[in-house]
Amino acid sequence: DTTRLLLNYYGLKIRFGQDPENQLCTDDFAGHWAHNANLSIKAIMGVAGYSEIARILGLNSVAERYADIAKKMAMKWEEMANEGNHYRLAFDRENTWSQKYNMIWDKMWDLNLFPNNVIDKEVSYYLTKQNLYGLPLDSRKEYTKSDWIMWTAAMSPDLETFKKFIDPLYKYINETTSRVPISDWHHTDSGEWVGFKARSVIGGYWMKVLADKMLN
């Protein structure tokens, strides 16, 4: 039945999600990297999401169990990814960074799973890595995914910080010489598109609207 299927699914998340092996993810443009920290966050938030589903269904003991597992996974994540003033792209890769956009769900669900102000630390670090036309996806290349920038920006503590991420993105859309419908994959230094155009992922641009609706 559905419950058994979900239990098996989240059992796999707990077993393999903390420190992912060489798995596919949406940020593989520069190649596959095992131990992907953002992919690990996705698994952790999945476990937390299962806890929330159980809570809504009145399965309080199940909710508490999986909430505790997610909390412990998040604490371990913080230790594994810690690079001092930011967190790594992959657990075993020193001097790397990446957008941890999957962490937006921790903020939106008001769970506070990740300790030591992880979100605020990451957001502050990202602001030091921005180029003329936006924040790169990670430390490997200068290109970005603008839908993920919008998710990342939605983690900002206030509107002023949010706008610091949005202004370069607006500049890209307004000034790019690539005459295609909005591309969600572009170079942050030149403002030219890499690929993709007019895709449904542009819906991710409305993450701030969703976050405000859920939190207010």
Residue ranges of predicted features:
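Aromatic-lined, polymer-binding surfaces characteristic
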Residues: 2-57, 63-66, 74, 80-84, ...
